[in-house]
């Protein structure tokens, strides 16, 4: 499934209205914030249909999956939106992550905890905002510049850059840092970013990670960032997205895709947008001087023109 899908569900007392943009949407929040009410409404409509007290408007069918029989329930659902309420422990398992990778559904998961087995975006973590009879989803982490904390008004001048892995993105920033007599380090996996920052509490660090899959780590890392003035987060969709956004490919189709990625990225084929942008960049540069591989950076990306075009996408970050 791909595209943006609007869901309007409600009774005569309360109505929720929201849009889903990706295959994974996380709803967070404390009790009494309406999360369970939303899932209850979907369940009631699923059981009672149009004759029941809940009305549901959506271009896709909506289902609730729960309990020990979740696998069998999922087997019978295609091209639909699946809601899962908190308390269903199976959402934390690798078994669940594997099972939903091969489906063409969108998933809306209610949880108070991070779900490290799932590569969900920082942009698709929401709380519920209710005003009178109306409820909607409000982004938990939103920054116009993809820079966190949001209160950052001046340009960020780090002494060190930390990337989440040691692939091409790290190799690019390592080379850039060397030019500016700065350090670049890798956390060797997004789940290690938090412990790295705790161990390096006195250093002025800019963390660069793939926003498209950093959702599970965001809560605890952002808490650190908000309590320490020497930390900042920069979360592009991915390093490949940065390259595609830089314009160095001069490709009209890429420009169109970047405008509305939801219209092009099928969740059945790409579990996260990061994977899609990697595949797109690899395909678009194959056989050219910009030939891209994820493991080893092509030196063409370190030429002044390419490098400066990529860095220019990083608003509010100054490395010189």
Regions found by a protein language model. Give the residues of each.
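Structural recognition of the conserved hydrophobic beta-strand(s) that form the central parallel beta-sheet
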Residues: 83-85, 104-114
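Conserved P-loop NTPase "ATPase switch" module shared by AAA+ and STAND
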Residues: 69-94
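The conserved Walker
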Residues: 31
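Acidic, divalent-metal-binding catalytic cores of TOPRIM
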Residues: 88-89, 123-320
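Post-Walker A alpha-helix
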Residues: 38-40
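Post-Walker A helix-loop "phosphate-sensing" segment adjacent to the P-loop in P-loop NTPases
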Residues: 44-55
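N-terminal pre-Walker A segment at the start of P-loop NTPase domains
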Residues: 1-16, 136-140
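Conserved lysine of the Walker
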Residues: 35
């Amino acid at each position: 499934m791909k595209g943006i899908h609007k869901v309007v569900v409600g009774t005569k007392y309360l109505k929720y209205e929201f849009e889903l943009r990706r295959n994974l949407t996380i709803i967070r929040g404390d009790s009494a914030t309406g999360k369970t009410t939303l899932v209850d409404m979907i369940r009631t409509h699923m059981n009672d249909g149009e004759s029941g007290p809940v009305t549901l408007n959506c271009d896709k069918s909506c289902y609730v999956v729960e309990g020990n029989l979740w696998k069998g329930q999922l087997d019978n659902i295609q091209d639909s939106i699946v809601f899962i309420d908190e308390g269903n422990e199976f959402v934390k398992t690798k078994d669940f992550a594997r099972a939903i990778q091969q489906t063409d559904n969108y998933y809306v998961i209610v949880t108070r905890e991070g779900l490290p087995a799932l590569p969900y975006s920082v942009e698709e973590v929401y709380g519920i905002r209710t005003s009178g009879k109306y409820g909607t989803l409000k982004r938990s982490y939103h920054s116009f510049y993809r820079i966190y904390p949001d209160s950052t008004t001046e340009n960020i001048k780090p002494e060190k850059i930390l990337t989440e892995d040691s692939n091409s993105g790290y190799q690019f920033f390592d080379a850039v840092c060397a030019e500016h007599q700065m350090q670049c380090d890798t956390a060797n996996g997004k789940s290690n970013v938090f412990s790295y920052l705790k161990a390096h509490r006195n250093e002025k660090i800019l963390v660069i990670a793939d926003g498209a899959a950093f959702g599970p780590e965001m809560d605890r890392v952002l808490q650190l960032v908000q309590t320490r003035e020497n930390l900042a987060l920069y979360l592009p969709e991915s390093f490949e997205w940065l390259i595609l956004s830089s314009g160095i490919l001069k490709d009209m189709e890429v420009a169109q895709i970047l405008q509305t990625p939801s219209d092009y990225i099928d969740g059945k084929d790409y579990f996260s947008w990061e994977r899609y942008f990697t595949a797109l960049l690899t395909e678009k540069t194959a056989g050219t001087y910009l030939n891209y591989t994820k493991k080893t950076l092509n030196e063409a990306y370190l030429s002044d023109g390419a490098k400066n075009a990529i860095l220019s996408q990083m608003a509010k970050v100054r490395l010189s």
